[in-house]
A protein has these predicted regions:
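N-terminal secretory signal peptides that target proteins for export/translocation
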Residues: 1-7
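Intrinsic disorder/low-complexity segments
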Residues: 8-10, 29
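Bacterial N-terminal signal peptides
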Residues: 10-20
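Active-site bordering "gate/hinge" segments
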Residues: 27-375, 380, 389-390, 492, ...
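Long, low-charge, small-residue-enriched segments that form tightly packed helices used
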Residues: 140, 360, 378-565
Length: 565
């Protein structure tokens, strides 16, 4: 074997050992993470002040902290909004927020209760070491005093309560060190603003469009985290979001709204100017169709088919929210505070469906995922978690606050921006079927079920609005399979029980729904078919139509906007 081959073999063994020992990827890739940390003024100030707090933070008659953490969020963002063909807002902003958590007691019982959950502060942007450390010092002192008061209040309350199966207040975690590159926001806003202006001119194409607005938000978010256990983490991620929304009114006064968004990890994943305008035109056309659509029938109980896009909303609301392992309030005996609290090792979905949450994935079948991260906001490495296996609930997503039967974190403790406490959160929630059907087979199954029950039509839902209210819903006629758009529908019984008992098939297709919100995450789901759901007419108030028409728009202006650009 040559010297070069020997060297390569040694390198291979070293990398293998680092990974098998759970060594942080950031550390394995960096020759000297400490040098990188010292070169970062924010991280250096956090580490220096943390060491000072560990040795000097002690009040008379109050125990010293057993745990301290500092978390800083640096958010550089640009936002813009256009309406009626003109830019209405154009703002570049940047802020740094600090959150300090000081825990008194021990891992079994500590002060993390009400005001003891942490102290917040605004951090300076100029990287002055003394200014940074001063804000850290102020927040740490305040957090320590609040922790002392909270521990007393908590112990007093516990004397009046009985908990059958108490669990620890905090989970231990191995220290990690990972220094990733900082994210930066560097772009020319002018072409993006022109895209917003062009899309918002679509109000001219339809006098009955009350408004058509477009907006964007680009963010570069850098996270810093250190704790007294030895964890030092810096990560950076950029997010890019573009939206448009149109509003109109049906002849009977019903308010109609449609929106569409594009969310990406990189600017290159956003649509081109032509694609963005084309999507906006499609949405405006859908609003015109919705105005002419008839109202949904007052009563229907039967099969309903949901597109992959619509099913992402169902699984986000009925599964995603309920697999989060939030610890119950003090004195409560439940496993969690959500609907699946008593469903551990019980069936929550049909046996052909399984669900995982895998924040380590960057893509799913070549589609980018927004919920990827390496280390969560509590300093724990992200892990893939099998949440539902063959319909059976097997896990909850948890952070470092244990719940019954789950004493340690599985890397899902994340914090809302800018400075909320960390808690269980989704990463990339992925639903799969062991018995997938083609789109044609799913529609045929819908029609067959309707025929068996002498129903003239079934329903197909393509998208949702808020609170699981369908926004695009179609009658699928048994006679010839054609689809007819209707409006004004709500579901009477779309809940966790119907998800468990009435969901009978899933497709081989899928949709990826990327959500930015305050905690970026992704939902991946197939189309799904329920054998029976109640669909009824919404009892919503209707506003009167405008008393007189909008200002006239010249035919030439309409033609200019309608022409492909």
């Amino acid at each position: 074997m040559t010297e070069k081959l020997r060297a390569l073999a040694k390198l291979f063994v070293l990398v293998f050992l680092l990974r098998s020992l759970g060594m942080p990827r950031g550390l394995a890739q960096s020759k000297d993470w400490q040098a990188s940390a010292q070169a970062d003024p924010v991280l250096q100030a956090m580490r220096v002040e943390l060491e000072r707090s560990k040795t000097q933070l002690k009040l008379e008659a109050v125990a010293a902290p057993y745990y301290i953490e500092y978390r800083v969020i640096d958010d550089d963002e640009y936002s813009a909004q256009a309406a009626f063909g003109a830019l209405g807002a154009d703002l570049r902003s940047r802020f740094r927020f600090l959150r300090v958590v000081v825990r008194i007691g021990d891992y079994k019982q500590d002060s993390y209760f009400h005001q003891g959950e942490g102290s917040s502060n605004i951090m300076p942007l100029d990287d002055d070491p003394l200014a940074l450390r001063h804000q850290l010092w102020i927040a740490t002192d305040r957090a320590y005093k609040s922790a002392a008061e909270s521990l007393t209040a908590k112990q007093s309350q516990l004397k009046q309560l009985t908990v059958d199966q108490p669990v620890d207040d905090f989970a231990r975690a191995e220290p990690l060190q990972s220094i990733e590159p900082l994210a930066k926001l560097d772009f020319d806003p002018r072409p993006w603003n022109r895209m917003l202006e062009d899309a918002s001119t679509l109000y001219k194409t339809d006098p009955q469009l009350e408004s058509f607005e477009s907006s964007l938000k680009f963010q570069a978010i850098n996270r810093y985290f250190v704790n007294s256990e030895g964890t030092v983490v810096r990560s950076g991620q950029s997010y890019y979001e573009m939206n448009f929304v149109g509003r109109s009114q049906a002849a009977d006064g019903m308010s109609l709204e449609r929106d569409k968004g594009f969310v990406a990890n990189t600017m290159t994943e956003l649509p081109s100017a032509e694609a963005f305008l084309s999507a906006a035109k499609d949405l405006a056309g859908t609003l015109r169709t919705m105005r002419d659509a008839s109202l949904v029938d007052e009563e229907y109980r039967g099969p309903v088919l949901f597109s992959p896009n619509a099913s992402t909303t169902i699984f986000a609301d009925l599964v995603g929210e309920n697999v989060l392992g939030y610890k119950p309030e003090l004195g409560k005996n439940g496993r969690t505070s959500k609907a699946f609290a008593s469903s551990y090792k019980s069936r929550v979905l049909p046996d052909f469906l399984s669900v995982i949450d895998d924040p380590t994935l960057a893509t799913y079948r070549d589609r980018p995922l927004l919920g990827k991260y390496e280390i969560d906001d509590e300093g724990v490495r992200a892990r893939s978690v099998s949440v539902v296996e063959n319909g059976m609930l097997t896990n909850y997503l948890i952070g470092r606050q244990p719940i019954r039967d789950f004493p340690t974190s599985n890397g899902h403790g994340r914090a809302r921006i800018p400075n909320n406490p960390a808690g269980p959160s989704l990463g990339n929630l992925i639903v799969t079927s062991s018995e997938p059907l083609s789109a044609e087979a799913m529609k045929k199954k819908l029609i067959d079920l309707c025929q068996q029950r002498d129903l003239p039509y079934g329903y197909f839902v393509d998208s949702f609005g808020s609170k699981l209210a369908p926004r695009l819903i179609y009658k699928v006629w048994v006679k010839d399979g054609h689809q007819e758009l209707v409006r004004g529908a709500i579901f009477g019984d779309l809940d966790t029980r119907s998800l468990r008992n009435n969901l009978i098939a899933a497709g081989d297709d899928f949709s990826v729904k990327n959500h930015l919100l305050n905690i970026p995450h992704s939902i991946v789901t197939p189309s799904i078919l329920f054998d029976e759901l109640e669909v009824k007419r919404a009892n919503q108030s209707k506003e009167k139509l405008p008393e007189y028409p909008p200002p006239l728009v010249s035919k030439s202006a309409i033609q200019q906007v309608s022409a492909a650009k």
